[in-house]
A protein has these predicted regions:
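Flexible "cap/lid" loop of the alpha/beta hydrolase fold
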Residues: 1-5
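Conserved alpha/beta-hydrolase catalytic His-Asp/Glu region
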Residues: 6-70
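Generic structural signal for small/hydrophobic residues in well-ordered secondary structure
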Residues: 18, 38, 51, 77-80, ...
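A general structural signal for short secondary-structure boundary/capping elements
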Residues: 21-26, 53, 82-89, 122-128
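Residues at alpha-helix caps and immediate loop-helix transition turns in enzyme cores, especially N-
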Residues: 34, 63-64, 88-90, 116
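Nucleotide-sugar-dependent glycosyltransferase donor-binding/catalytic pocket residues
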Residues: 60, 84, 110-113
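Conserved loop-alpha-helix segment in the C-terminal half of the alpha/beta-hydrolase fold
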Residues: 70-108
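Catalytic active-site module of serine/aspartate enzymes centered on a nucleophile-bearing elbow/loop
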Residues: 98-129
């Protein structure tokens, strides 16, 4: 039953809807190649269900507050401007460590590196120069 449920959850139609509704600012920019790759990676390897199970069971939501407070290196957050609660997320990180710097990429959502790679590259280069 577990494999059946996993196959439903990682179906191409579910991945496509997630990209259109949650990952991309403009749903018409979703390239079918991205859907193919995500679908393929959900079914390849020795344990493709591991990441899905970890996300569903909230194992990927570790509290890193104490670690962030102690970091004395540069930390830079880059997010999509239309990502839900991005300003709040950045604020929470900077509350832990005021040295954290951030930028948002306009007209992008969850995957700014795919939606606008030129702007992401420009922003990253600006930070490291």
């Amino acid at each position: 039953i577990g494999t059946l449920l996993y196959n439903f959850a990682s179906a191409r139609s579910i991945i496509s809807r997630t990209f259109s509704e949650s990952y991309f600012y403009n749903p018409y920019d979703v390239n079918p190649h991205y859907i193919d790759k995500y679908h393929e990676s959900a079914h390849l390897g020795d344990s493709p269900k591991s990441v899905y199970a970890s996300v569903q069971c909230n194992y990927t939501k570790c509290n890193i507050t104490k670690t962030l407070e102690k970091i004395d290196n540069s930390i830079y957050i880059l997010g999509g401007e239309a990502e839900q609660d991005i300003d709040l997320i950045i604020k929470e990180y900077t509350k832990c460590n005021p040295a954290i710097e951030s930028s948002t990429i306009p007209n992008t959502k969850h995957l700014p590196q795919i939606e606008n790679p030129e702007e992401v590259s420009s922003t990253v280069q600006m930070f490291f120069n």
